[in-house]
Structure formats: structure tokens, C-alpha cells
Curated annotation (Swiss-Prot):
Encoding gene, per UniProt annotation: RTC5
Reported function: May be involved in a process influencing telomere capping.
Keyword Hydrolase: no
Keywords: Cytoplasm
Name of the protein this chain belongs to: Restriction of telomere capping protein 5
């Protein structure tokens, strides 16, 4: 007699290969008919359930990738394609059905099947290498019991049976083994660099996005690779990354990794012919960054990925080339607190301040005044540099300011969304934990983030740096970032200590000579349009006032000529 077709659940034993086939059929149903048709067209096949072999070059063409990131992605898909029985690491090809399984896993679509599988562990295993020279095959040959949500006539008809598998009850899926595995740091750099390239591409018509992907991989890879190097500093310093360290880093890097994999799957499954995509997000004016020394595509992507990882309102800030507005460039407008005020204070949306310079190696005369006004934490006998700090370091910090700027000579401003980010020489994040953490002082005390109000009375000038703070002196020439995690610090605490695992518990300072200072406005399309209208209105008002003044000047001159104070030739009259 055949199996009962009642609604009662039952189990059936399958070989590991049959279990993989069941999962393959289930994953194929997670892609839409249009996506399946597109993939068949790209693979030049009649069905996506084929054992046709794809080489690394084939996959690179399918995903629009080149070396070096294509090899990392290829190995990742190879291993996941054989899930739940991860493939051997020396496999040289991947089949079409394995590609679909891997794609549904890395994109997160597999969650619709209610698999009891940890996504982070899946990604780690896909990127990882085993310490062992070989993997025993005995465990892979054991039959697997598969539970069904209802009875079926023929459990050996795998395509039909796959529709009724209770994937949530599959034992072993939830326990992806991570012990004894590690990720090569160099491969992690390549993957993060690729995802930063993807993150830098604004959402619009697919064909435009994919064209930009190819262009940036060809032309801008080195700058994104350097940004990928910076991101890996969030992972404990080792050439071999364990799961524990990888998992900790995903707390901040998770959104970047997830979006990157989703984008690649979309590239694979989307039709980019001109007629296929009629919807397009309106593209704003492209950012002109040629004059900026601190902002480029890779920097924007790095900041955007960091904000996304922070969560909260920071994650809601969309950072692209299209929604950044140049407000102030010290190299263009001059390094003056008044110039900074005139350029920045009219902007009523979030801003990003970037300050960069060279580490102070010798005391110069102009610095001595600032040094005398800035309280020392370290004894003169202590070395001013930690092992990771070098005398010739370039130092760059960014500050996300969520509230509009204001003169604050008596009371600080700002909310808890204010965030300090160290960009160079090590990437780190210092989250705001208290409001009123910013001052903009026009009476000779500069800018402070995380400080109390400075003292400025008669002949006494004194800064009051917080335990985690960035201080910029009034001439915009010198700056100090202070990070005191010990109880010895006496300043206020407006920012949390860094998230870098290696140095978050240490006390240190970055003192530097400022070479560049820039402020960029961040806004949605609506905010940018409203701000433009406001600026246009202010410009017209200024022109109108100038016109009135010129007319008034003409009337005043005629009156002076009548009384003989001004002659026709412009010479003064006698009294």
C-alpha cells in the first residue's frame, strides 16, 4: 500500500544527496517566474534544475565581477551550494541548482522556508577554511530523517515531496559547525571592499546600477580596497578570523554584508535589458567632490555602512553622492571660525564635519598657547604614543551632528545621535550617550564635541575636555581627540568609549596639526529642495536690498550736490 495522503505528518529517510535535492527544489520556488526565466536566459538553458557546470569565469560574468573579489564570492557560493552538507574546498565548479541554493541562503530568502539555521554561521562557514587537511565522509553518508507536514503518496517523487517538507523540524540544520574554521583576513578585505563598492551605488534603474558597479570595480577598486582594510580593523587583529570575532564584528558590519549579498543575487536574477525596468528612482544632482580632500565614493560608502551598523536615527541617514551638499571647505573658504559659521549655520538638516591632519611630532610656537590651555592627562614622563600610533600618522575624524548648528558660548547643544567616527589611522566609533555635547564658541575657544563649556574669563582660558572628546581650537589649526576609559578621567562623559575590541579599554590621545576641515550637509531629496528654495529666496532678498541701497545712494548724492558738498567732478566742497 502507498503512503497515506491524510493531513497527519510523517517522516521518511533520505540520503544526503536526496536531502540536498529536496532543498534545491524548495529554493527554486523562492525565485519568481520572471527571475527563473532571466536565469535560464543567462545560463542558456531550458531549466534551472540542471547539473551544468559553471566555472569561476562563468560566475564572474553572471555577477559582473572581476578579480580579486570574484574568486572570494565564487568559493563562498561553491560551499553553500551543497548545503546542508558543505562541499569540499577543492571543488572547481558549481552547478545551476547549487547556485540557486547558495543564492537563496546568502540573500536571506531561505528564511521563508523556516529553516532553523543561523544566517551568520552560514556566511562564516561559506567564507571559512578548515584547519583540517581533510573532512571525513562517513557522517555525510548517513541517512537523514525528513519530517513532512502532511502525508504524501510518493515520498520518492522529490519535486512533489519538497512542497511538504517541514524544514523547521530538520535536526542538524541549526547547528552549523564553526569550530576549527577561520576566514582569511585578506579575503575578508576583498569581500568588504566589494560590498562598499555596492553600498556606494545609489538606488535607481538596475541597468544603471550594474553599469556603475562595473565602472567602479575597474576604476576605483584601490580606494575601496583601502576602505575595506579600514573596516577589518573592527575585527580582532589576526590573519585568521574566528567565528567569535566574525560574529562580534557583524554587530556593526551586518547591514553592509547582508545588503552586499542581496545586491549580488539581484544582479544574477534581474534582466537588465533596456525594456525590462521602467521604474527608476529619481536621481539627484551628482556630488561635485573634486575640490574635497576628505570625501570620495569610498569614504561615503564607509560612513554610510558605519551609520547603518549603529542603528537608531543614524541608520536612518541615507548617505550618497546625491544627498551630500558642500557647506564648508577650509581649503576653499579659509580656516576661520567666522567663515565656518557663515557657511554652516543656514543648514537645518544633519551635517558631517570632517577634520584631518598630521600627528604633532614637535612643539611649535603657536601650539604652545593651545597646549597650555588644554589640561594634560598623561604625565610628561609617559610616552605620548601607544603601539598602534605612529609619529607620521595621518589622522582623520568625522562627527555626525544631527541637530542644526548654533552659537553656544554659554550652553552646549546637540542630542544623543551625535557620533564621532575615527577614520584614520584606525576605524572606530564613539556613540553619543548624552545630549548637549557640542559647543561652537565664537569668543576664542573653538569647537568642542564631548566637552564641558570652556572657561574664558579675563586672562584665564581653559578647555574642559570630556573623557571621550574632540577639541578644535579657535584658529582651526590644532585638534585633540581624547579617549580615557579608566576611572582616572575627570571630564564629563558624553560619548561611549570606542568599539574597537583591541583598544576600547585603553587611554590615549591623538594630537594633530589640522590640514583639512570640511562640513557637508546631509538631506533627503525633499530637504535638499526646501533648502535650495530657502537659499534662492535669501539670495533674491540680498539682491533686492543691494538694489535699494544703490537707488538710495543716487538720491543721497543728488542732495549733497544741491548743498554744494559734492561737486560734479567728485571733489569735496569747501567749508
Amino acid at each position: 500500500m502507498g503512503q497515506s495522503s491524510s493531513a497527519e505528518s510523517f517522516s521518511h529517510s533520505y540520503s544526503p544527496q536526496q536531502v540536498h535535492t529536496l532543498l534545491s527544489y524548495a529554493c527554486q520556488r523562492l525565485i519568481t517566474p520572471v527571475e527563473a526565466q532571466t536565469l535560464r536566459k543567462k545560463l542558456n538553458s531550458t531549466t534551472v534544475n540542471e547539473k551544468a557546470q559553471l566555472s569561476r569565469a562563468d560566475l564572474a560574468q553572471l555577477l559582473l565581477l572581476n578579480d580579486p573579489p570574484s574568486s572570494v564570492v565564487y568559493k563562498c557560493l561553491q560551499k553553500l551550494g551543497k548545503f546542508p552538507f558543505f562541499g569540499e574546498e577543492n571543488d572547481s565548479t558549481i552547478t545551476a541548482d547549487e547556485l540557486i541554493v547558495a543564492s537563496m541562503l546568502i540573500s536571506g530568502r531561505f528564511k521563508k522556508l523556516k529553516l532553523n539555521t543561523d544566517y551568520d554561521k552560514l556566511i562564516f562557514r561559506a567564507l571559512a577554511t578548515s584547519k583540517l587537511d581533510a573532512v571525513t565522509e562517513k557522517s555525510e553518508q548517513l541517512p537523514v530523517s525528513v519530517k513532512f507536514g502532511r502525508g504524501i503518496e510518493n515520498p520518492e517523487h522529490l519535486q512533489m515531496a519538497s512542497r511538504f517538507v517541514d524544514w523547521s523540524s530538520m535536526s542538524g540544520f541549526e547547528s552549523v559547525d564553526t569550530d576549527g574554521y577561520f576566514i582569511s583576513r585578506s579575503e575578508m578585505v576583498q569581500l568588504l571592499a566589494l560590498f562598499l563598492v555596492i553600498y556606494s551605488i545609489p538606488k535607481r534603474k538596475r541597468i544603471s546600477m550594474q553599469t556603475e558597479l562595473s565602472q567602479k570595480l575597474d576604476n576605483d577598486w584601490r580606494s575601496f580596497e583601502a576602505a575595506g582594510e579600514q573596516l577589518t580593523t573592527f575585527i580582532r587583529s589576526s590573519e585568521k578570523i574566528s567565528y567569535q570575532d566574525f560574529s562580534s564584528a557583524l554587530a556593526l558590519l551586518g547591514p553592509l554584508v547582508h545588503y552586499g549579498f542581496e545586491f549580488l543575487v539581484d544582479v544574477m536574477l534581474s534582466d537588465t535589458t533596456e525594456h525590462s525596468d521602467t521604474t527608476e528612482t529619481k536621481k539627484g544632482p551628482d556630488l561635485e567632490v573634486t575640490k574635497s580632500h576628505l570625501i570620495n565614493s569610498s569614504t561615503i560608502a564607509l560612513l554610510a555602512a558605519t551609520f547603518a551598523g549603529l542603528g537608531g536615527k543614524q541608520a536612518g541617514i541615507s548617505l550618497t553622492r546625491q544627498n551630500l551638499v558642500k557647506l564648508y571647505l577650509g581649503s576653499e573658504s579659509g580656516f576661520s571660525i567666522r567663515s565656518l559659521e557663515s557657511k554652516v549655520f543656514k543648514w537645518h538638516a544633519p551635517t558631517i564635519l570632517l577634520v584631518s591632519g598630521e600627528r604633532l611630532r614637535t612643539t611649535i610656537k603657536r601650539y604652545e598657547t593651545f597646549d597650555s590651555e588644554y589640561p594634560r592627562f598623561f604625565r610628561s614622563s609617559e610616552s605620548p604614543l601607544k603601539p598602534w600610533q605612529q609619529p607620521n600618522d595621518k589622522i582623520t575624524y568625522a562627527v555626525l551632528v544631527h541637530e542644526p548648528w548654533k552659537v553656544s558660548n554659554k550652553k552646549n547643544f546637540g542630542d544623543t545621535n551625535t557620533t564621532i567616527i575615527a577614520l584614520e589611522p584606525r576605524l572606530d566609533v564613539f556613540k553619543g550617550i548624552a545630549s548637549e555635547s557640542i559647543y561652537f564658541n565664537t569668543l576664542g575657544m573653538g569647537l568642542g564635541f564631548g566637552n564641558s563649556q570652556p572657561i574664558n574669563k579675563n586672562t584665564l582660558k581653559r578647555y574642559a575636555p570630556g573623557s571621550v572628546s574632540l577639541t578644535i581650537e579657535a584658529n582651526l589649526e590644532f585638534a585633540v581627540f581624547r579617549h580615557i576609559s579608566s576611572q582616572a578621567g575627570s571630564g564629563i562623559t558624553s560619548f561611549a568609549t570606542g568599539v574597537q575590541p583591541d583598544i576600547s579599554g585603553q587611554d590615549y590621545e591623538d594630537r594633530f596639526l589640522i590640514t583639512d576641515l570640511e562640513v557637508w550637509g546631509v538631506g533627503s531629496s525633499k530637504e535638499l529642495e526646501e533648502q535650495k528654495k530657502q537659499w534662492d529666496w535669501e539670495k533674491k532678498q540680498a539682491e533686492a536690498r543691494q538694489s535699494v541701497n544703490l537707488r538710495s545712494m543716487g538720491e543721497d548724492r543728488a542732495l549733497l550736490e544741491m548743498v554744494g558738498l559734492v561737486g560734479n567732478h567728485g571733489s569735496g566742497g569747501s567749508v
